[in-house]
């Protein structure tokens, strides 16, 4: 899969390295030329491009039309919205994933701005804390499809009813709306 990531900070770089390790074709765009050069030196196998991902010409030069996924992972919400909109509207990228830095801005990250999936690190951590405190064994990892679906982690305690502990997942009768992922 061809993935273009905008933002060479710690988040964007970590994602780029993980996806590269999984044999995806990854391009990492970083607007700070000096920092982009540093990334190239530190990670010689990583395709790093020194360019401003908010500029149409830079995205065109990075061949966004051939991207399967664009990840807007800069530290600036406004930049991430511009990148998402350009990726979806101007380059018809099938999947756009966007980082939300300030959870107060979450309402903006929707299909109108070209966002397919938004990830808010502050909201995710807050949710993990809230769920761990309130429920204990069910953790809401993230909302998907603009709140229509949730990715949750369920951990059964050793004191859970044997009917749950002694069955495989395929033997459990799960609601048709439930999907198990690993």
Regions from the language model: what does each represent?
Residues 1-182:
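Cytosolic regulatory regions of ion transport systems
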